[in-house]
Amino acid sequence: MSQSIIESKNKKDVNNGKIPAKETILSPRFYTTDFEAMENMDLSINEEELEAICEEFRKDYNRHHFVRNSEFDGAAEKLDPETRELFVDFLEGSCTSEFSGFLLYKELSRRIKDKNPLLAECFAHMARDEARHAGFLNKSMSDFGLQLDLGFLTANKDYTYFPPRSIFYATYLSEKIGYWRYIAIYRHLEKNPDSKIFPLFNYFENWCQDENRHGDFFDALMKAQPRTVKSLSQKINIGGTTFTHPLFDYFHRFRYFLNNLPITSKLWSRFFLLAVFATMYARDLGIKKDFYSSLGLDAREYDQYVINKTNETSARVFPVVLDVYDKSFYGRLDKIVENNKVLSNIANSEENKVSKTLKKLPTYLSNGYQLLRLYLLKPLDSKDFQPSIR
């Protein structure tokens, strides 16, 4: 988060109208996890709620929602070059993010279906939704004569490993923040139809309900997980080499026990909330600001609304949430945005690599300091915070 926002194009050539996603520090990430631990999860503590959510997934409320209509005909040609570029960049990032979710959920459903069929079915339904979203976004890109090469992404994207617990935190927040982002844009454009630059936004109201249901699933899954893993793993990976021994299962059990201590849960909750909020804020105010302006939105007001709402929603599952109402909270995020502009200017200068690195160092340290101060802000206890949001 404290690094600069430097964009570098993939070296793969553009062929047949397809383009690979551009990489930035704040680009959507592709994830993998411990499939053995996932398949051994005991859902019995909250199985009834998970089964109810799975039944909702089976109904597939949006089966017939993502059908294009005549409003798309010629819509791309109506955009001026600057707005066109901003919107295509939005489509690319959104499509990559949805496709990332599809790959993770699809692989999970495939790998755990024999031992954990309920969990596997839920992930399969969510993979269906994410694939539908990614395809719909990619179809909109084709209106501009472009298309993301999703096959190339699958084969060449770097995958970040997260243990299951971290996957739960990260994907829960990703889905819930996606809900608030989409519904905020939809409501704004319903009130300001002249700012609706493309018919894609007409689909956001129902679309965001998919995100909301996915978030509810991870909420229920986390409630099922306080010390409920039947068996973890007899394997351990050191330096890329996997070792197997029954004793390693006890090591993983001890690590899992530590991760489930109340203080640990509070620390991780604060970490993931801050990581997600700071990343979004830095991206939207740093490199996406003009896109939101094209929709008639103030990026700062929009992000603060989304962060506040996501923080409130997270109090239903996390033991603590961030004090986003502290007067220093957004001030420090704004400082990070300013620092990232400085880092970007240095990166784009004509100086040599060593000189650039030395000039960037104080700004990196400043970003790290701002993030540390934000993390150390006294959090809000969810049990005290919840009544005001329900």
UniProtKB/Swiss-Prot annotation:
Belongs to the AcsF family. It catalyses: Mg-protoporphyrin IX 13-monomethyl ester + 3 NADPH + 3 O2 + 2 H(+) = 3,8-divinyl protochlorophyllide a + 3 NADP(+) + 5 H2O. Its EC number is 1.14.13.81. Keywords: Chlorophyll biosynthesis, Iron, Metal-binding, NADP, Oxidoreductase, Photosynthesis. Pathway: Porphyrin-containing compound metabolism; chlorophyll biosynthesis (light-independent). The keyword NADP applies. This is Magnesium-protoporphyrin IX monomethyl ester [oxidative] cyclase. The gene is acsF. Its cofactor is Fe cation. It comes from Prochlorococcus marinus (strain MIT 9312). Catalyzes the formation of the isocyclic ring in chlorophyll biosynthesis. Mediates the cyclase reaction, which results in the formation of divinylprotochlorophyllide (Pchlide) characteristic of all chlorophylls from magnesium-protoporphyrin IX 13-monomethyl ester (MgPMME). InterPro entries: AcsF, Ferritin-like_SF, Rr_diiron-bd_dom. One of its GO terms (biological process) is photosynthesis. It is an enzyme of class 1 (oxidoreductase). The keyword Oxidoreductase applies.
